[in-house]
Regions:
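Short, acidic, metal-binding catalytic loop of nucleotide-sugar glycosyltransferases
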Residues: 22-23, 46-57, 67, 77-82, ...
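A conserved hydrophobic helix/loop-capping motif in glycosyltransferases and polysaccharide synthases
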Residues: 28-37, 44, 51, 63-65, ...
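Catalytic phosphate/metal-binding cores of nucleic-acid and nucleotide-processing enzymes, i.e., regions
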Residues: 35-37, 42-44, 74, 78-79, ...
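Active-site-proximal specificity loops/subdomain of glycosyltransferases
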Residues: 70-134, 348-409
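Conserved donor NDP-sugar-binding/catalytic core segment of glycosyltransferases
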Residues: 129-130, 143-184, 427, 432-457
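Short beta-strand-to-loop acidic/aromatic patch adjacent to the donor-nucleotide binding site
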Residues: 132-146, 410-420
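Short, flexible, basic/aromatic active-site loop/helix in glycosyltransferases
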Residues: 164-168, 179-205, 211-221, 453-473, ...
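An acidic/histidine-cluster motif and surrounding catalytic segment
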Residues: 167, 211, 231-235, 241, ...
């Protein structure tokens, strides 16, 4: 690594000290093989355009076939628009047939499909060699390179085959750390420290796939081949395994780099999945990127490049709710933008509710609303009174409850602006609604996002209804369904006259709060509360994450502007109970 870095540095120093003009950027062939990728191409192509690399030093090699969507049209239109920017364009479309003879579905990888893709990749490799290209960049059409310096950074590693580690919603990534004697994936303890970036660098691995750079200037690269398989190859017919075996037989080591965040890609759907499943999975990838402080702006810029031209018109709706309320502080415009876009991508419409800014409330405001804190209330973690942020949060939800009652809204969805959606969120929410309606569940409130506090016993499941439980003591009001009857019950409790945080008030109202003294102030506690299980939304950030901001806990005490909360986040018991935002899922 030191030697490679020194070599690259010496080249840079030589260029800087030389009075002659600088060297041209290396010649790159970008090989793209797309099938049924209309849903991902606008973002993928936008990310390619945004790479900080001279376009006139890049040749595009693009193939597409066996499509049942408008992938061909999108690629053709894009190539026509950008062809003068790039050095060369090779375009290989094939309209028919729309399916392989031996595949039961579009997501099934049959032998004919594997062989076809390998032949296309080999054709791209041979074209790159004929053009005397310095590098071949292979990229799948749903891989989003949000780091604009990716190409330069990979080149600087001076490796024959090197991949940028791609992020996903699970532990899955575009490399293997282990391979069995038959060429299949093997779990190893080395994988997760690399995947989580607990160890950073460029690591020798037996397999990289999806997006990687091949240095054609290396002599050993002449022995690399995607097709046909090496004469000694006896493993399964799989394009990535065949190429990894070719690299092994050529004594070429594959590397994966995780020094930075380079980009994102979706977790592959199962072979029996539909194209719609894949579309929704990719939408979730977009939402995950928008939830990351590192990727949000890059994705926002690229998305608009093609959206208005090539994507079908999006018709947001309320999916059966009378209203969808999204709470947002006016000064948190970044959150508002992200949430509106996230909802739009899922074809969901909402009413933006301006949150009550607790910091802007003064003593006169509080007295005019006749607000009084619940006698004896202290935060269970910090032994402090209510904060102004918590007061503002409560009033924001309270105002929505009033609107639901005033408008007579039978069913509403209430969400906050700091949540991230689980994969297939819309479909799962619709299924939940259908189940509740079908079995005539008598409900007032259904959490779709929360922090369950009573973890020492299981919550009671609801007979005949999948994925719903009776809610026990819970924190957070990230998202919940509320009925008209539920809103009326909450208002009848007159909570402003005995105020406590909203996520403490709700468990009181469904008679599950562990502090009996609090419940004693509310005579009627008959709110019928349930929860989706598993949950449908989670926080965008957990305490301690980079980019974490709390508008409720880090503020002054509600009735004393001079008294700030001496809250040490690192020592917080709540922090310890929340834990970190760990990778969910498995490697595959």
């Amino acid at each position: 690594l030191v030697e490679a870095g020194a070599t690259f540095l010496s080249k840079i120093l030589m260029i800087l000290s030389n009075p002659e003009s600088p060297l041209l950027a290396p010649r790159v062939v970008l090989a793209v093989v797309c099938r049924n990728s209309a849903h991902s191409l606008p973002l993928f192509l936008g990310a390619i355009e945004r790479l900080d690399y001279p376009k006139d030093r890049v040749a595009l090699w693009v193939a597409t076939d066996h499509n049942i969507d408008n992938t061909t049209a999108i690629l053709r239109d894009w190539l026509i628009k950008v062809q003068n920017d790039y050095h060369y364009v090779e375009w290989r479309p094939q309209e028919e047939p729309r399916a392989f003879e031996d595949e039961p579905g579009t997501k099934h990888w049959s032998n004919l499909r594997y062989e076809h893709v390998m032949k296309l990749r080999q054709a791209a490799l041979e074209s790159a060699r004929e053009m005397w290209a310095d590098y071949l960049l292979v990229a799948d059409c749903d891989n989003l390179l949000t780091n604009t310096d990716t190409l330069w950074k990979l080149m600087s590693e001076n490796k024959t085959i090197v991949a940028p580690m791609l992020e996903s919603r699970a532990a899955y990534s575009n490399f293997w750390c282990g391979m069995t004697s038959q060429g299949y994936y093997k779990r190893t303890p080395a994988y997760m420290p690399i995947r989580k970036q607990e160890q950073r660098g460029c690591f020798a691995v037996p397999m990289v796939h999806s997006t990687y750079l091949v240095d054609l200037q290396k002599e050993a690269s002449r022995q690399l081949a995607f097709y046909p398989p090496h004469p000694e190859y006896s493993w399964a017919l799989d394009d990535v395994i065949v190429f990894a075996y070719s690299a092994r037989m050529a004594d070429v080591q594959m590397y994966v780099c995780n020094k930075e965040t380079y980009g994102y890609f979706p977790v592959p759907v199962r072979s029996h999945a539909t194209l719609q499943d894949e579309v929704e999975s990719f939408v979730h990838t977009q939402l995950e990127i928008m939830g990351e402080w590192r990727g949000q702006r890059a994705l926002t810029k690229t998305r608009m490049t093609y959206l208005h031209e090539v994507m079908e018109s999006c018709r947001p709706n309320k999916i059966g709710f009378d209203e969808v309320f999204m709470i947002n502080l006016v000064r948190r415009s970044d959150r508002r933008e992200r949430m509106l876009r996230s909802l739009y991508e899922q074809e969901l419409s909402c009413k933006v509710v301006a949150a009550v800014d607790g910091k802007a409330l003064n003593k006169t405001d509080i007295e005019s609303m006749r607000i009084k804190m619940l006698p004896g209330y202290k935060d269970p973690y910090h032994s402090r009174p209510l904060t102004k942020g918590e007061l503002g949060c409560f009033l924001s939800h309270y105002n929505i409850w009033k609107e639901i009652a005033d408008r007579g809204l039978q069913t509403s969805l209430v969400i906050e602006d700091d949540l991230r959606f689980e994969v297939f969120f819309k479909r799962r929410l619709q299924t939940l609604l259908q189940e509740v309606t079908k079995h005539k569940l008598d409900w007032d409130l259904i959490y779709i996002g929360r922090k369950r506090m009573q973890v020492d016993h299981q919550e009671k499941s609801v007979p005949n209804i999948h994925n719903i439980v009776e809610a026990d003591y819970s924190y957070w009001t990230l998202g919940y369904l509320l009925s008209l009857q539920g809103a009326q019950k909450l208002l009848r409790a007159e909570p402003l006259s005995k105020l406590l945080p909203v996520d403490e008030f709700l468990p009181v109202m469904y008679n599950k709060h562990p502090v009996s003294e609090y419940m004693g102030h509310f005579e009627v506690r008959d709110l019928r509360a349930f929860s989706a299980e598993p949950l449908l939304v989670y926080p965008t950030h957990y305490t301690g994450d980079q980019g974490y901001i709390s508008d409720t806990e880090t503020s002054v005490v509600w009735d004393n502007e001079a008294l700030k909360t001496d809250w040490d986040r690192a020592k917080s018991r709540k922090t310890q109970e929340q834990g970190g935002a760990e990778l969910r899922g498995s490697e595959l």
